[in-house]
């Protein structure tokens, strides 16, 4: 066995422990986390003949160390939860030494770490979603400010953030307009016809003070700034995706519920190389959609899903809501069928798992998803027969790449 190194990563320090071929401590040292110190760490590991290095995924502090070492060593990123669960550790063993021992005995399963372009795409995609959350918060704050002034127009429109009429009204209020009749003229005719012109006019008759105007100005300035930042993230993300993953995006867009933006988000999290996951079930487990196996003496105690990649989980759930509403796809029909005999959110997770398996096979086979082969055939207008072709849509040289489908209901 070659020499191995375990790194105990902290915010301001890194503890390194190198073990020799016999498992004895060969070298120990504490380093800082500034770039010159990390460079010294790399040089020392090279000088000592270390081949493999392992560290725990401590917050974001492991990332700079990974960037410095990745070109010279075989790196392993370990989940701290799994390291702590391994038996045999003595109380006096240091963290770095224990990590090195586990690495030397091949007891550590490496976490999935993206590199290069995907690393950049991840930052853009996650920032885009953070900005979306901030935007929703500001839109709610804006609505609260209008409600304080007894401007109740938001009660009669949906999707307040992107409502053009509401934006026009706010800009008019900031400009000094107070006449509810003139404000009502800015409202789309469809909204006036639906709720009545007088009702809309009355909803715009409020009591506004100067402090309210200042709060509206600040909210609108922040919203405009976030929208510009969001557009910038989307532009950079689109450029990277178009240059490196144009084919994969077009393939993913053939799946019900997935558009260009969600396809880019998915690729930023999973990448386009599915060899990182042995089967679709490994990808399902990585995201946390695989039910926990909590069964004893034939009695199932829990089927709660596990923890996983929260970013991809949110994206897949949003996609699933979109696909579940469609009655023109196999997924929408399957959701309605499952929702009749279980809670709607449980049915949603079941469909989300199906979509994740489809995504895995689309990226693995480089073949578009043909939802027509999965549609349910209606016979005589009453009896619904599910066309069971989902199992043989994806074949590689005659071998079924979806054998794990039979482990669960459906896909």
Walk through the language-model features, giving the residues of each.
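A detector of single, family-specific signature residues
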Residues: 1-411
